[in-house]
Every structure is written in structure tokens, then in C-alpha cells.
Amino acid sequence: MIEIPDLDYHNREYVDHLPISWDELDQDCNKLAEQITASGFVPDYIVGITRGGLTPAVILSQILKVPMYTLKVSLRDGAEEDCDHNCWMPEDAIGYGKMGCLEDTPANILIVDDINDSGTTIAWIKQDWPGACLPNHAYWNEVWHKNVKFATLVDNTSSNEQVDYAARVIDKSKKDIWIDFPWER
């Protein structure tokens, strides 16, 4: 993982923003793929969180040669009603969905987003998926970070949730940095 260097507080151009170029995005996705491969985790498919997770999810899908699906999670400004609630991804996670119905085994799912900032998106998924289908299934205690893993381009270590793979690490409790992803310009 890349530690983001201390920024010069006297240089106002870079105090609050860290721009990431398309080339750096490609390098970061390759780093994530290397981490995933080195860990031995082989995803059956990738879930790209809209909107920020779509670009890295597509790139990782190509590198790892696995299919990609999308999940709309928009939690900014309390807009939880703007989220996809589905059953087949949660059912896959515990072995009853699309992938698991033939073998009755849990699917390996890699959830990809641009940044783990506060942890709200990951927390929402961890709450929504068990609630969507089979909420009392005993396997939910074993799903997270085992066969359902999280990857982000940037991980804020002071977040309330943890990711399994990150290309860059920041700590917003020490220095508040806004990441400028190339698709945001």
C-alpha cells in the first residue's frame, strides 16, 4: 500500500486535495489485483459500488478476468432511499443465490469502491444484506472479510469499517484530504 506523503501546508494548491491521474488509477488497480491474488482470494464476481467504485471495478474485472455487477449505494446527505436492495447478492454470500444454487456453497464476492472514507457504505451493506434475505441465517457471522471482501483505491484508517485491500492509505483524523479521482474532473 502507498502511504500518502505529508502535504506542505504552506502550498495551498495541495493542502486539501490529492489529485489522482488516470495512470495512477491504473497503477493502483494493478496493486489491488496483486494484493488480491497474493492473498489467495479468488472472487467469483466483483460488485462495483456506483458511482465511484465503477471505474476501479471494471478495471479489476478485466485484470482478474471475473464478471462485474453494480450496486447503487448513495448515502450522502441521508439519501438511503437511493440505494439498491437486492436478494441475489446476499443469497450468493451465504450460498443460496445465483452462484450458490448449483453447489450450495457461498460465492466469493469482491465489493469495490473508490474510497473507504467514514465506513458508511460498508456498514450499510453489512446491515442491508442480512436484512434483505434470510436475516437469521447463522452464516452471516462468518461472511464478512471471509468470502465477501472489500477493496478500495483509498482507505481512511480512521474509518469505522475496515477494508481487505487498499492501494493507498490515509488517516483523516490527522489530516483531512480530499481525493480528486480522475473521473471527477
Each language-model region and where it sits:
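PRPP-associated nucleotide enzymes
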Residues: 1-185
